Amino acid sequence: MIREAIARVSSGTDLTPAEAGGVMAEIMHGAATPAQIGGFLTALRMKGETVAEIAAFARAMRAAAVPVALPAPGARVDTCGTGGDGAGTFNISTAAAFVAAGAGVPVVKHGNRGVSSRCGSADVLEALGVSVAIPPDRVGEVLAAAGIAFLFAPAYHPAMQYARIARQEIGIRTVFNLLGPLTNPAGAGAHLLGVYDPCLTLPVARVLGDLGAERAMVVHGAGLDEIATAGPTTVAELRGGEVTTYTLDCTEFGVPRSSVAALRGGGPEENAATLLAVLAGEEGPARDIVLLNAGAAIYLGGKADGIAGGIAHAEASLDSGAALDRLRRLVEATGGAA
């Protein structure tokens, strides 16, 4: 099937959902060669992926994933980004996840090691003492104990190994950069999802709706795959099956502007120190952007009527020590070392 799909996509023809799902199933089952996968991904990138294609790819990846047994998704939130923005910031969405959890929002964060950055979410969590390699049958236990669980993507998507060589060798962004945040095996009902290009906010929000998400904000701000404090943020929000687009500015919520340079990170130990400082209540640009993103996650989780209310809950989560306590609980629940 993939050979026929390469020919169709190379001529500019969109794939049907069945065709797209079939190609991804071939890739996930090791039935396509690296050359075929690389050719397909490159042709698809040149044509441009449709919402229907991306949704079909995501469904096929989810079908090939290691299952996680949890109750119905409900208000569980994932704070995740595509990466690839090249900004080299500290792990903002990971910090926001602990703040949201401290405000009472169950968080199932899907992530990986650094690919386009020096420090991915798994890297910084390990530096903080979290054991990221918990088996699928313990995710529910960890979530109940800590209010937050981390799902290390390679442990749940082993079939991705078949695409690894092709992705490395072609060296360009492909649809797989989008699929990671769309394939959380724990079935989060709400997503705060950052993308590396503002043009992706609307289509990715539509994909999430197609995949059954209840709530989502797909965001890109000032060159970051986050809600930004350095400038306006483009948002596509999914709610009630409808997607609306708008621009927001941190100053609307009383959050001061700051430069991207003030948010620069480094390796795992450096980023862990920054994250710990934020969770311990340190003031400054790092806290400000975490409050903004955590406020959105809390809003998506149903604990606030809007981002402003979410930010108020986020401030309480930090100032009461609840966010830091969620980190402590996660370390204990995963058997890590503080």
Curated annotation (Swiss-Prot):
Keywords in alphabetical order: Amino-acid biosynthesis, Aromatic amino acid biosynthesis, Glycosyltransferase, Magnesium, Metal-binding, Transferase, Tryptophan biosynthesis
Binding site for Mg(2+) 2: 225-226
GO molecular function per UniProt: anthranilate phosphoribosyltransferase activity; magnesium ion binding
Domain of life: Archaea
Signal peptide: none
Top-rank EC class of the record's enzyme: transferase
Subunit structure: Homodimer.
Protein name: Anthranilate phosphoribosyltransferase
Organism per entry: Methanoculleus marisnigri (strain ATCC 35101 / DSM 1498 / JR1)
